[in-house]
Regions:
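Hydrophobic alpha-helical
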Residues: 18, 37-101
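Conserved donor sugar-nucleotide recognition element shared by glycan-biosynthetic enzymes
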Residues: 10-14, 40, 44, 120
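Hinge/cleft segment of the Venus flytrap/periplasmic-binding protein
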Residues: 2-10, 20-24, 118-167
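Short beta-strand elements in bilobed, periplasmic/extracellular small-molecule ligand-binding domains
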Residues: 1, 19-41
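Beta-strand segments within the central parallel beta-sheet cores of soluble alpha/beta enzyme folds
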Residues: 1-3, 32, 87-91, 148
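Loop/turn elements at helix/coil->beta-strand transitions in domains of secreted/extracellular proteins
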Residues: 24-30, 56-60, 85-88, 106-109
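A general structural signal for well-ordered alpha-helical segments in protein cores
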Residues: 14-15, 70, 100, 120-124
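Short beta-strand elements at the ligand-binding edges of bilobed clamshell
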Residues: 1-5, 34, 105-117
Length: 167
């Protein structure tokens, strides 16, 4: 597990829910290592390089709290001479353009779209409610009257075309 900034809410939640998803699916897991890479590709590459030296072929899956760290893990594997078909199953979060390209190339198995446009729409709706003198907690669908949750969408090779910019 490549985690973002220590104590950062997104890093904590992405780590927690990745683990919960595996447990819910009853996937047998042996955790070999986890470390913070502070959302940075270079730091993630260094961590992965260390793990490859320590664990070698025992690494089957790498969860990264963002796409840059997932790409850093891929960089380390390829720099170590690993063939694409031998890469661990690596996933990230954010559906950034470089990550989508890596999904298309087959080096990144998937990412999760962090819906910036949807977040902006929710922020605008909250602002409009407040400016209109309304309580957003009662006029909008907010959890506990405070939180706007958006669904995350998994992006894999199967649905990649939906997320690529139109040419």
């Amino acid at each position: 597990m490549l985690e973002g900034e220590p104590g950062h809410q997104d890093a904590l939640m992405r780590t927690e829910y990745s683990v919960k998803a595996l447990m819910t699916a009853a996937v047998p897991v042996e955790k070999l290592a986890n470390d913070n890479a502070n959302w940075e590709r270079g730091q993630a590459s260094l961590r992965m390089e260390q793990w490859l030296q320590e664990f070698g072929d025992a690494i089957e899956v790498v969860f990264a709290n963002n796409d840059d760290m997932a790409l850093g893990a891929i960089d380390a594997c390829l720099d170590a001479g690993m063939e694409q078909e031998d890469l661990p199953f690596i996933v990230g979060v954010d559906a950034t353009p470089p990550a989508l390209e890596a999904v298309a190339q087959g080096t990144l198995q998937g990412t999760v779209q962090n819906d910036a446009a949807g977040q902006a729409e929710q922020i605008l709706a909250i602002c409009c409610a407040v400016m209109g003198g309304k309580d957003p907690g009662t006029t909008l669908n907010l959890e506990d009257g405070k939180y706007a949750w958006l669904e995350y969408t998994t992006v894999t090779a199967e649905n990649l075309a939906e997320f690529l910019p139109e040419e």
